[in-house]
Design a protein with these regions (language model features):
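A glycine- and small-residue-enriched flexible loop/hinge signal that marks low-structured segments
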Residues: 1-206
Length: 206
């Protein structure tokens, strides 16, 4: 497969292999916008496996292409079971800085910025979601406006809804990981807390 940027699946596979080197590559979140699980399952599985093996980051995973159905999203989410991954939906519209045109892009383009804002305004163990920390200011609109029932369907499948509210704009309205079992680790902020603690302990040990 070749993505919209002309990169082949093997290009991603080679890059993923490099990221196994924890001495030279440090990060606490990874996303690969446009490389969605429905069409690039081999690559997204490799990224997830690498993320789990490293134990120091969370994979913001795109599940489906633009204009997919909720059933397709929840079905794809059902094939993943890990607290080291989180998924968001739907796609969002923003302005291309190079052309000035409106374009739809996958949610994983923006979500790491939400995490970074949470780190800067609070701490990694705060939920990167909601009106205060989950606002998507650079987003013009979501691909579709989710109903309450839509949001419930997504959240039950461990997919975090990107919701639209009057006078609030577009907001990340959930912080679940893709772990199926109900526990503290089915929350993004808990997984990120443990990642932060692991990094802190590692620095002390060094």
């Amino acid at each position: 497969n070749t993505d919209s940027q002309g990169l082949k699946g093997t290009d991603y596979t080679n890059a993923i292999a490099l990221l196994a080197d924890t001495d030279n590559y440090q990060y606490n979140v990874i996303s690969v916008p446009g490389l969605y699980a429905a069409d690039y399952g081999t690559q997204t599985t490799s990224i997830l496996n690498n993320t789990i093996a490293r134990g120091d980051s969370i994979f913001v995973m795109d599940l489906v292409a633009y204009n997919s159905s909720i059933a397709a999203v929840t079905g794809q989410a059902g094939g993943v079971d890990s607290s080291y991954a989180a998924a968001y939906w739907p796609w969002v519209q923003t302005i291309d800085p190079n052309t000035g045109e409106l374009v739809f892009i996958p949610p994983s383009t923006f979500i790491p910025g939400i995490y970074a804002f949470t780190d800067a305004s609070a701490d990694p163990w705060f939920a990167p979601a909601g009106i205060n920390r989950g606002g998507m200011g650079q987003v013009v609109r979501a691909e579709r406006k989710l109903t309450s029932a839509n949001r419930d369907s997504l959240y039950e499948a461990n997919v975090n809804p990107i919701a639209t509210f009057p006078n609030q704009g577009v907001v990340v309205f959930g912080q679940k990981t893709l772990q199926k079992a109900a526990s503290a680790l089915d929350r993004v902020n808990v997984r990120r807390l443990l990642i932060t603690l692991k990094d802190f302990i590692s620095q002390i040990a060094d």
